């Protein structure tokens, strides 16, 4: 587990552009996930699926069912984004367990980027489901005076999403480091178990909140449209 702070520690620079530990680890995770996805799809078989393939199918099926329960009419549209978000955040949270690796989600800039992506996806999926004119109209109905309150709500929940994940992962790693400094390496297994459980929980919460925000945006606008058409 690396050193934590509001921003990841500097690693090196390329042409004056600073490269941090979180950037390096993020690229490592993305490349690793791409290779894993490619190898799974390249070798997949309907007749004789491998254990590796069955594990991935089980994970993706569980995610698909979870999304379907929240947003059944748009699951095909939402699934790629939310599933990718879940997997990336889970791996990012867990990689801090490996000595020498830094959890990107312990860097506020990374969690802020994920929150901004979620913020943009809420509006992107809403516009795709309804059209940009009808979607934007709902922000000024029943009166344009509600627009500032809508904007404040969108910004505040995006900030909360970023800070929640960052704070939990950073505090988890700091707590683990403090315990290890005090007790030494006599109790590594409980610390690792705590880290793994918390990493899974935080990845699930972030992905579920993103899903709820997307579903809320789509369904709220659809309900308003249905009410106006009656």
UniProtKB/Swiss-Prot annotation:
Recorded family membership: Belongs to the ATPase A chain family.
InterPro entries in the cross-refs: ATP_syn_F0_a_bact/chloroplast, ATP_synth_F0_asu, ATP_synth_F0_asu_AS, F0_ATP_A_sf
CDD domains the record matches: ATP-synt_Fo_a_6
GO annotation, cellular component aspect: plasma membrane; proton-transporting ATP synthase complex
Subunit: F-type ATPases have 2 components, CF(1) - the catalytic core - and CF(0) - the membrane proton channel. CF(1) has five subunits: alpha(3), beta(3), gamma(1), delta(1), epsilon(1). CF(0) has three main subunits: a(1), b(2) and c(9-12). The alpha and beta chains form an alternating ring which encloses part of the gamma chain. CF(1) is attached to CF(0) by a central stalk formed by the gamma and epsilon chains, while a peripheral stalk is formed by the delta and b chains.
PANTHER family: ATP SYNTHASE SUBUNIT A, CHLOROPLASTIC
Keyword Transmembrane: yes
Gene3D superfamilies, sorted: ATP synthase, F0 complex, subunit A (1.20.120.220)
One Pfam family matching this protein: ATP-synt_A
Keywords: ATP synthesis, Cell inner membrane, Cell membrane, CF(0), Hydrogen ion transport, Ion transport, Membrane, Transmembrane, Transmembrane helix, Transport
Protein's name in the database: ATP synthase subunit a
Topology within the bilayer: Multi-pass membrane protein
GO molecular function annotations of the record: proton-transporting ATP synthase activity, rotational mechanism
Record's function text: Key component of the proton channel; it plays a direct role in the translocation of protons across the membrane.
Transmembrane segments: 17-37, 78-98, 107-127, 165-187, 198-218
Record localization: Cell inner membrane
One annotated GO biological process: proton motive force-driven plasma membrane ATP synthesis
Predominant subcellular localization, coarse grouping: membrane
Gene name tied to this protein: atpB
